């Protein structure tokens, strides 16, 4: 699946024109995740559809969702900007930035320096880089370019091998372990439990995908995660604020 998405993305990049630059106060993803009021940091995701689950919500208001996520205690908002597979939009980033004071992570398949430029133009604070999408050396170049433009990166791995290749080149400040197998689409927090041991202590660790219960959160926290990235579980709920309260119930997580 990742190959199919990346092929579409390469096609889009060949047509990409930079939008007008949007200016917003910068917010640090890493700092915000470190000073959470919840038992661990929460990157709450705005995602209308996905390749694995199809359409999650017929219509969405990214600004209304972002406001509720902020009220619920999220540390950052992840905004899907890919249109083809996730029904996202690059315009959502600025809309969310105008609405909340949290850092905004642009979630897309970033493969080229031009997309890094675009990410800075649309007003994001941070962007995703996927280790499985390119060589570690190329990822490092995009990472350095992003930081030179004031953007932080969430660097995502799906396996021990990917993390090993990455660490041979550099140690990202924020590392995500994605619990979703991109071939089968199955998710399991045991991915985080397995790979977290290899994450250097100086990196901030985010467990991503397939987090649906307080027990999932308790397990990844115990494995060493500093934060979680949650999409579907929140997007499917009408009362997203209550959904955050239910997921992060202290007693369930700390038992
Ligand atoms: O969500 C998918 O189906 C998907 C398929 C292929 C590549 C990426 C995909 N998702 C991107 C994500 O990383 C998730 O949206 C994010 O981690 C949240 O996951 P979830 O809480 O399971 O919605």
UniProtKB/Swiss-Prot annotation:
The keyword Lyase applies. GO terms for biological process: L-tryptophan biosynthetic process. GO terms for molecular function: indole-3-glycerol-phosphate synthase activity; phosphoribosylanthranilate isomerase activity. It catalyses: 1-(2-carboxyphenylamino)-1-deoxy-D-ribulose 5-phosphate + H(+) = (1S,2R)-1-C-(indol-3-yl)glycerol 3-phosphate + CO2 + H2O. Pathway: Amino-acid biosynthesis; L-tryptophan biosynthesis; L-tryptophan from chorismate: step 4/5. PROSITE patterns: IGPS. It holds the Pfam family IGPS. The keyword Lyase applies. Keywords: Amino-acid biosynthesis, Aromatic amino acid biosynthesis, Decarboxylase, Lyase, Tryptophan biosynthesis. Its EC number is 4.1.1.48. NCBIfam families: PRK00278.2-2, PRK00278.2-4. HAMAP family: IGPS_B. Belongs to the TrpC family. This is Indole-3-glycerol phosphate synthase.
């Amino acid at each position: 699946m990742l190959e199919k998405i990346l092929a579409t993305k390469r096609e889009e990049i060949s047509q990409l024109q930079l939008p007008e630059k949007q200016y917003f106060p910068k917010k640090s993803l890493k700092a915000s995740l470190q000073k959470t009021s919840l038992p661990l940091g929460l990157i709450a995701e705005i995602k209308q559809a996905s390749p694995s689950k199809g359409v999650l919500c017929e219509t969405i208001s990214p600004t209304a969702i972002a406001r509720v996520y902020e009220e619920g205690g999220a540390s950052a908002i992840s905004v899907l900007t890919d249109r083809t597979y996730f029904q996202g939009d690059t315009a959502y980033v600025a809309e969310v930035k105008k609405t909340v004071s949290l850092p905004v992570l642009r979630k897309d398949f970033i493969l080229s320096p031009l997309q890094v430029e675009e990410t800075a133009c649309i007003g994001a604070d941070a962007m995703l880089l996927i280790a499985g999408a390119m060589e570690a050396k190329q990822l490092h170049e995009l990472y350095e370019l992003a930081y030179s433009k004031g953007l932080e990166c969430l660097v995502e791995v799906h396996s021990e091998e990917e993390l090993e290749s990455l660490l041979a080149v550099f140690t990202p400040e924020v590392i995500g372990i994605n619990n979703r197998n991109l071939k089968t689409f199955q998710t399991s927090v045991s991915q985080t439990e397995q790979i977290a041991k290899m994450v250097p202590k100086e990196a901030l660790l985010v467990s991503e995908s397939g987090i649906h219960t307080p027990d999932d959160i308790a397990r990844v926290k115990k494995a060493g995660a500093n934060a979680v990235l949650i999409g579907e579980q929140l997007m499917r709920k009408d009362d997203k604020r209550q959904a955050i309260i239910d997921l992060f119930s202290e007693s369930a997580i700390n038992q």
